Amino acid sequence: MKLTEIQDPSFLKRMSVSELELFAGDIRRFLIEELATTGGHLAPNLGVVELTLALHREFDSPNDKFVWDVGHQAYVHKILTGRAGQFDTLRQHKGLCGFPKRNESVHDVWETGHSSTSLSAAMGIAVSNELKGNDDRAIAIIGDGALTGGMALEALNHIGAEQQNVIVILNDNEMSIAPNVGAMHQMLGRIRSSRKVRYAQDELETLIKKIPLIGGKLEKGGEKLKEAVKGALVPGMFFEELGFNYYGPVDGHDLTDLIEQLNYVKKEEGPVLLHVITKKGKGYRPAEYDGIGTWHGLGPYKIESGEVIKGKSKAPSYSFTVADTLTKMAREDDKLTLITPAMSVGSKLDCFEKEFPERMFDVGIAEQHAVTFAAGQATQGMKPVVSIYSTFFQRAYDQLVHDVARQNLDVTFTIDRSGLVGADGETHQGVFDIAFMRHVPNIRIVMAKDENELQHLLYSAVKYEGPIAVRFPRGEGIGVPMDETLHEISLDTWDVEREGTDVAIMAFGPQVQDALKIAELLEGDVSVRVINARTIKPLDEKMLNALYAEGIPLVTLEEAVLKGGFGSAVLEHANEQEAFPRVKRFGIPDWYIEHGGVNELLEEIGLLPGQIAEEVRSFVNQGKKQSV
């Protein structure tokens, strides 16, 4: 059967193991060939081919519900549920989503993109099944990296306590994006090296029965002995102690073993955990031997050489600029530390880690812990910097409010991927952080217009004593010359980038360049003043009051949600001053922005410079007509 002819996974039940093994090879070749053109999460999916085949063979989706943690490893699931023909549109505008999507298929029952949510969702599904009186199964597939997340551990505790019918498939590949860290990872390593617990139990019972005369009595009273043996085989028996029936570890690329174990698992009552050992990138050498996470998610590549196809770089990335600046500062300040929740690769932190390993802390997928860990350091006079993606910072909101800002602690947040990120879609767009930070007392929020200003703004932010967030976008800088010496710049004032008399556009970050383009497009018709409003909080009240007094129409521009955003702050300030300027706001509307190219998404919501220019022209002309 051609992969593009698949309608649903029911055909798998008619296939022999040898046929499934050949089919697994077809799927791997398909993924390698398709993603070479589109890019995507290659390594995670190559690692779960056999596991996904076995799951769909032994269970009955969509009656039995598969809940994929994070979701980037669901490509094989998508192929088996009739979407192979859409892979040429993967992660593209209006195309196939790179994560499970409920409106794509009845087989996608849970949408995700952030980690550690699957166990809680699966328990919710299992409870609902029980209340409705059906015997459908809830199966959560979670990686060993995601299992380190606090939410996953909370769910393990609850599922075990309630003895809920949840099947947990632990996909253990020793990596999340990069290699995993922490005590949970070390414990799983000890389990990997042990013998299989269930097999050991069976062998123990057989041996006891064979003991002459007393074998039968020992078998009846041998529970303590069996538990002692299990404890010796698997240190701590962590999952069994939490109330789970533990199976494994099993080779995640051995279909015979997988199918056998899944048959045991689906007959169990109560919570079950099947520990599956997989190889991330299995079947494609560059991905299989990737030790740092390059092949976790990437753009197009050359299949033969494994070379990632990149355009000519015109400037260092914003992430590199931040990491490089922090490394330079750490040479002069031995109190500066750097904390990341498992995003050291994406945020280019290797230069800092290489030079200052003792001051670099990768806490794993644990955003809440990362922020409060930083707060604890700050109470002792250290200068912690938390490097975190905008979308993942959402997970540490209470820690920001309660532990950092309330105590006015000296913690710097470098907010990576601020703004639209494109192909990863609605779960990853960095558009909410301004709105959820702006109303928190004590914290400052800043964003530079380019990579050169970014290094100085970050330098100033770290020097500042108190909580401060430095936002910066994904991708390369704009190619401006970089100053060799760092210096402080104001964290309270804005700059006029271009003079104008008809309208003033206030923008920050990359949107300053957009505002300058808008001014050029309107030149000769509308005289546009462009203001670099790099301090989002606090506002430059002196400049704003001068603008109110002048009576010039105001435009705010932000690649963030309008509700509660920068434009809202300007309106609030004007109201407080009893000033009533004409204000037009541009930003992200009140809906989730899906996946696609950034420019395609900006066009869809009307935020390209040409689109804004026409709106500004109308806004200014309307004001002129009203004043006549």
From Swiss-Prot:
GO molecular function annotations of the record: 1-deoxy-D-xylulose-5-phosphate synthase activity; magnesium ion binding; thiamine pyrophosphate binding
Protein name from the UniProt record: 1-deoxy-D-xylulose-5-phosphate synthase
Summary of subunit composition and partner proteins: Homodimer.
Annotated source species: Exiguobacterium sibiricum (strain DSM 17290 / CCUG 55495 / CIP 109462 / JCM 13490 / 255-15)
InterPro entries according to UniProt: Dxylulose-5-P_synthase, THDP-binding, Transketo_C/PFOR_II, Transketolase-like_Pyr-bd, Transketolase_BS, Transketolase_C, Transketolase_CS
Catalytic activity: D-glyceraldehyde 3-phosphate + pyruvate + H(+) = 1-deoxy-D-xylulose 5-phosphate + CO2
Gene Ontology biological process terms, A to Z: 1-deoxy-D-xylulose 5-phosphate biosynthetic process; isopentenyl diphosphate biosynthetic process, methylerythritol 4-phosphate pathway; terpenoid biosynthetic process; thiamine biosynthetic process
Pfam families membership: DXP_synthase_N (PF13292), Transket_pyr (PF02779), Transketolase_C (PF02780)
Origin superkingdom: Bacteria
